[in-house]
Amino acid sequence: MPRTHKIEDYRNFGIMAHIDAGKTTTTERILYYTGKSHKIGEVHDGAATMDWMEQEQERGITITSAATTAFWNDKRLNIIDTPGHVDFTIEVERSLRVLDGAVTVLDGNAGVEPQTETVWRQADKYKVPRIVFVNKMDKIGADFDKSVESIRDRLGAKAVPIQFPIGSESNLKGLVDLVRMKAVVWDNDGLGASYRDEEIPADLMDKAVEARAYLVENAVELDDDAMEAYLGGEEPSIETIKKCIRKAVLTGAFYPILCGSAFKNKGVQPLLDAVVDYLPSPVDIPPTKGIDFKTEEETTRKASDEEPLSVLAFKIMDDPFVGSLTFCRIYSGKMETGMSLLNSTRDKRERVGRMLLMHSNNREDIKEAYAGDIVALAGLKETRTGDTLCDPLKSPVILERMEFPAPVIEIAVEPKSKADQEKLGVALQKLAAEDPSFTVSTDFESGQTILKGMGELHLDIKIDILKRTYKVEANIGAPQVAYRESLGRKVDIDYTHKKQTGGTGQFARVMITFEPGEPGSGFVFESAIVGGAVPKEYIPGVQKGLESVKDSGLLAGFPLIDFKATLTDGKYHDVDSSVLAFEIASRAAFKELREKGAPKLLEPIMKVEVVTPEEYLGSVIGDLNSRRGMIQGQDMRGNATVVNAYVPLANMFGYVNTLRGMSQGRAQFSMVYDHYDPVPQHVADEVIKKYA
């Protein structure tokens, strides 16, 4: 089947937001108005089309990025649903990698919230063009102007409204379109499908003229001809303004702000128009970078069917009907069923069996897909999240790898029976393949299975899936903090390993300089050997020895991170030296760091934001201080106070219940991992006693 839409008519975009800003409802309405969904699914009753895992329906939060294809004004929209809960930022990050543009949804009552900041920063990292939709304008206390201010203040982004609401709260009637200078009004019946243009109400005319002048001044700055004409007193045409807004979105010069209420079916169609008018097509973004599979030189792929095939696998899901599904973005070339592909990341072959176009959870079998498409492949055996698939014969490539953060929290799981043990192994293998921020390991001493993740909710949901989807009965331990260790000072260690008991002995002497590295630098090994004091073939043994012990740490068995080891000198014996002897020597040298390297225990510090009514402020701050929290500041949001603090994760377990009790359920909080910090000595002593 040949292409049905030109690649210029594609819009691959996602909807990103804080939890509860109305992201899923907005997506639902988009699917409804674009004709892909016959009934509107409400998150309130757990039936939204995009939220198709049982766990999501129950909790009313979107966990997995489902990809959906829909159509609007002859344009093809591929919508990637991204989760809004902070424990799933990995999912957001993964979907941002494959998007060309995004709609940021804000709650008109709350404005920019902590998770909005997190996903905005991630979108900055991947340079994703954005437009902003201020939702929930029907809510009591919704304030469009204040939301726009919060974008400027909290995100440091240049916000330029291209609409503003007519009426507010329960009297929300529609919006003023500042590009066309028309009022757009919805009827209250017919689920918002019918709407019409009217003249702008007289009492809003002054505001509209002022807001449009601000829009036009910012828009014409991006086009020399338009700027010249405007300075000469000529008002730009609607087409010119749209062209300039599009340029602003593509370059990040400013962000157009729209408004409405998805729940009340107002403002969604103009939002779709804006997606088509302002967000980029695959050809508007820079070519995708990659590494040539054979030469390892940097190379690029343009968004074109004529280029060699390059595909990124960005999500793996277990589907009850089809088995394992791999969601893929085709960056270049054409893919057909039956084709043999190279997984260039792992140097393995794959075959395209079934290829599906997804609509949240209905699927359509297709035979061919082209550059710009987002499809799901069934039955891939070797492919994991972040892998590249390409044509093995036409200049194979490895696209940029996605980087995933290290988990900060862990729990032990013990299956109740032998049958559960077997089911658990299979289930965990699948869950780890689907989600790179979730890892599984075995504690060698206790034999327990350890699950590691990004937060309490993240692990709760994994356990829920184990019990519900895979029917595993297991005992779950209490959550534990993923502590780390670091060196306190630079130190030289000289160690000789000698074992001579008749026959061939073992001999190796190593002199290693250990020093603390920058945060995030990981383990770095260097050899500064000159003149063959240690023969070249033995040096890998030194590195291997250090790598085998660094994760067992020095103080309490936690991985030693961010340090550099330089092999400066050593000695060997013609007969008794071997790679193994140097491996043993470097391991023993590492252990001496406990006494000589002033090791420190590190703990994950979370960035916490609590939103509380004024009357509970004292209790909230007192409680955070008692948790070793460092209060960073507070400001007002509506009639609530927002407290920002850094708090050790170890002191945040069960905080949700404490806060609920303290504020009669009226305060909320969110937290994200921020950095690792040394643990105060009196606390470190207790932790070391517990784990060592």
Curated annotation (Swiss-Prot):
- Report the residue ranges that make up the tr-type G domain in this protein: 8-283
PROSITE patterns with a match to the protein in the record: G_TR_1, G_TR_2
The UniProt record gives the binding positions of GTP as: 17-24, 81-85, 135-138
Any one GO biological process: ribosome disassembly
Principal localization reads cytoplasm
* Entry GO CC: cytoplasm
Instruction: Name the CDD domains on file.
Output: EF-G, EFG_III, EFG_mtEFG1_IV, EFG_mtEFG_C, EFG_mtEFG_II
Which keywords are on file for this protein? Cytoplasm, Elongation factor, GTP-binding, Nucleotide-binding, Protein biosynthesis
Q: Which GO terms describe its molecular function?
A: GTP binding; GTPase activity; translation elongation factor activity
List, alphabetically, the InterPro entries matched: EF-G-like_DII (IPR053905), EFG_II (IPR041095), EFG_III (IPR009022), EFG_III/V (IPR035647), EFG_IV (IPR047872), EFG_V (IPR035649), EFG_V-like (IPR000640), G_TR_CS (IPR031157)
Give the matching Gene3D superfamilies. Answer: 3.30.230.10, 3.30.70.240, Elongation Factor G (Translational Gtpase), domain 3, P-loop containing nucleotide triphosphate hydrolases, Translation factors
Q: Subcellular localization, per the record?
A: Cytoplasm
Q: Does the keyword Chaperone apply?
A: no
What function is annotated for this protein? Catalyzes the GTP-dependent ribosomal translocation step during translation elongation. During this step, the ribosome changes from the pre-translocational (PRE) to the post-translocational (POST) state as the newly formed A-site-bound peptidyl-tRNA and P-site-bound deacylated tRNA move to the P and E sites, respectively. Catalyzes the coordinated movement of the two tRNA molecules, the mRNA and conformational changes in the ribosome.
Q: Which PANTHER family match?
A: RIBOSOME-RELEASING FACTOR 2, MITOCHONDRIAL, TRANSLATION ELONGATION FACTOR G-RELATED
User: What's this protein's family per the entry?
Assistant: Belongs to the TRAFAC class translation factor GTPase superfamily. Classic translation factor GTPase family. EF-G/EF-2 subfamily.
Q: What is this protein called?
A: Elongation factor G
Gene name for this UniProt entry? fusA
